[in-house]
Amino acid sequence: MRAFLEEFKKFISRGNALDLAVGVVIGGAFGKIVTSFVADLFTPVLGLMIGGVSFQNLVWKIGGSPEDPVTINYGSFLQAVFDFVIIAFAIFLLVKAINTLQRKEEESPPTLPPPEVVLLTEIRDILNRHSQ
């Protein structure tokens, strides 16, 4: 049991596992924010613009009794599609920004040593040649 706990401790303390855990927590919170944005802000305004429609009430009745109809709730589906598109766009922007930063780091020219270091290196080389 102790070996199992030690192995788990090593696993959880590695960077990848911690990064994944942080990503999952932040992703879950971000998903809730986007869902609220779509349900509470975006779709009501969009519904108002297209004629006072509430997306939550958009249903297609396909059968059943009038008291208990069988419905396809395509308004809720549209809200989920809006959620997905907004989250996918946000992730795209994040990945694009990270890739741009990585490219800038890769493209940066090698830095030259300061003039003092160059001078000291030359002096060292001269002294080495004279001592031989």
UniProtKB/Swiss-Prot annotation:
Q: Which domain of life is it from?
A: Bacteria
GO cellular component terms, alphabetically, are: plasma membrane
Major subcellular location class:
membrane
Q: Which PANTHER family match?
A: LARGE-CONDUCTANCE MECHANOSENSITIVE CHANNEL (PTHR30266:SF2), MECHANOSENSITIVE CHANNEL MSCL (PTHR30266)
Q: Which residues cross the membrane?
A: 11-31, 75-95
Q: Does the keyword Cell membrane apply?
A: yes
Any one Pfam family here would be: MscL
To which protein family does this belong? Belongs to the MscL family.
What organism does the record attribute this protein to? Answer: Synechococcus sp. (strain JA-3-3Ab) (Cyanobacteria bacterium Yellowstone A-Prime)
Gene symbol? mscL
Native organism taxonomy = Bacteria, Bacillati, Cyanobacteriota, Cyanophyceae, Synechococcales
Q: Which InterPro entries match?
A: MS_channel, MSC/AndL, MscL_channel
- Name of the protein described by the UniProt record: Large-conductance mechanosensitive channel
